[in-house]
Structure formats: structure tokens, C-alpha cells
Amino acid sequence: MVNIEAPSPNIIFSEFWVREQSEIEKDLAWYRSNAPVTFVQEPIMPSESPIPQGAGTWILSRHAEILEASRNPEIFSSAQGITILDSPPEFNEYFQSMIAMDDPRHARLRRIVSAGFTPRMLQKLEDSVQQVAADIVDNVCEKGEIDFVVDVAAALPLKIVCDLMGVPESHYQEVFDCSNVILGAGDPEYLPADGDILSAIFNAGLILQGIMEEVAESKQGMNSDDLTTALVNAELEDDKLTSADLASFFILLVVAGNETTRNAIGWGLKYLTDNPDQRQIWVNDFEKVAPTAVEEIVRLASPVTYMRRTATTDTILGGQEIKEGDKVCMFYLSANRDEDIFEDPYRFDVLRQPNNHVGFGGPGPHFCLGAHLARREITVMFRELFHRLPDIQASGEPDVLAASFIHGVKHLPATFSPVAKNNR
């Protein structure tokens, strides 16, 4: 086991990720150069904590090892959890989604959910993204000064996910708040008054499950044009989702489909503001440049910082002996800055090709199911912004989420010249 004096604070602590970006980048480069596969200790848990004490985890910081682990799910399993700290058993009922499963369970759920995305459903999604983006700009265009994350970046994926699942608008704020609690665990802004983080996360899962059960019950036997209706009424080779499957899938959509797109859009405005030459290249030929620009935003933003796997057998990775049962964490954000893969990796380049990033996860069965939708949302949102608020820019520094799992932006001030609403 490699034993090298690593940077401080520990990479698995949220304190590592709320520092100046230059400090984070310097330390990630240190890991890639000096200890690309290295073991770090987990924090000591209080004796009364329901979280089991873990020995530690292997950190993968280079692109090559992350691809190798992603392509070998039979050796690097998702079923024991996807975060560094193990969850209390009672959490599994709400958070044991397909992302934390191996085949054949993972393949079964993914197959059923994929079947729900019919051509008609996909067309509805395309139309919905355009309409929602236009409505969002209408809601802010006369203000001239906004919190870009709250008013724009978060509003789009939240509305799309809720519409997709048939969730009534009356629940939108509740869904948004629960998402913040689950993924912002530990950030002071989202801490409950009593400081009990685990209870807050558990209760957020309970609320989301209740919302989904209510929606699913209302869709039984109906012919509504949403994914929940398709999933509760359709059977695929005598197989269908249970209510627990449906609830955990909804939670996955809320936290993955909502938060990751929100953070990509939020970081995207920051990158475009800091790199006006790249912004102009995109504006000059939006449709042609959009595919590479969106991939570059996702690469640098890396909305999901890492994913954990667990070794199912003794193995060798990056020259290190990994034992059966060891945790292995793939730090996507570091891999997306790997100097061996990306030329000038810290440069924001909207024309970057090739761009073999792992911002949607590595290759293999767990590649992001919603990658196509996320790309579409990012493209449409920036098209609408460039067209109607052409001088919009970040007017301050992002307020970064204090979390190690999500590379999040909580708030980002933005300014633009006010314009009138569209008459539609």
C-alpha cells in the first residue's frame, strides 16, 4: 500500500473542495503525478453515529485507471454504495437506485426505464426544454440582475424532471429543497437547525418517496403523457417497476438529473464570462459550435466529483494491490484535467476535439442514462440566453457547495441589460 504524504486537507473531505480553485487544481495535479492510485483514511466517526466506521478508500485521480475500473464492473462493484462513507441500512430503501446496483438488477431496471422513453416521450421532452427555457428567460429578462443559479440554472432541470415524471407544480419547491438537502449534506446553508444531517437526508428521501407514491397512484390506468404513467402501466416481458423501484428512480432523477445539469449550466456561465474569446466563438456560430462547447462545459464542470466502487476480488490497478472489499473512488474531476489526455487541460476551449471526458461517468453499464437530455438542456438554455440576453455575464464569484461528492454552485450573481418579455 502506497504511503506518501498527501496534500492537506484530505481529498475526501468537503474542506478540500471549498478552497480557491487554484489550490484544488494544484493538489489534484499532485495526486495524478505522485500517487494516481493511493489509499487515504476515512474520518473517525463519533461512537454514536449510525454511519459505519470505514477503514479508508483508494483514490483514482488519473483518466486511465478510472476508465479501467469503469469498464470492469464485475471487479469494481456499485452494489456496496457509491459514496465514500457507507450509508446506514435504513437509507437503502430510498437511495438504493439503479446507480448503486450491479447486473442483473441494474440491467433490469435500466431496461424497463429505457423502454419508457418512447419516441413520443422524447419529442415531448425536446419541446418541453425549449418552452421552459423561454419561460425562464421571460421570468428574469426585465430584472437586469439575478442569482443565475437559483433563477436560471436550477429552474430548467427542476421543471423538466418534474414534468417528465408528472409531478404537480405545487410540489416543485419541495422537490428542489429536498434535492439540496440530499446533495448538500454538510453545507452550512442546508444544515437543519438541530444540525442532524442524517435525519434531514432521511426525511428528504421520505418526502420524495411520498410525492412519487402520490403521483404513481394517480397515474394507475391513466393515459397521461409522462414517464410515470408509462412506467406504472407498462410491463416489459412480464416485468415492471415496484413502488420502491419507482421512488428510488425518482430520487435518482431529482438529485442526478436536476443537480448535475444545474451545476453544468452554472459553471458554464462562469467559464464563458472568464473566457470572452471562447464565448464569442460560440456566439458567432452557435449551432455548429454547440456540441463541442457543451462537452467542454461538462468536462471542466465535472458536476459529479467522484463515484465509488468496491473491489469484489483481489486485483492490481495502477500498480497497486487492491484487496477484496476495498473501496475505490474514481475522481472524475481530476481525470478531466489529466495532462496525458487533454492538451492544456485547464484552458476552456469550446472547439476542443477530441474531448474524451468522464463528466457523465466512465464507459460501461453506468454511463449516465440522462446524458442526451443534459446536453440538450445545456444547449437550449445557452441558445436562449445568447439570443435574448446577449450581454449576460457572471458579476461575481460562485458560492461553491461545501461537498466532496458534487462540484456544485449554490449561487452566482449575474447581470445583463434588461429587456421586455416576449409576447407569446
Name each model-derived stretch.
Residues 1-424:
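Cytochrome P450
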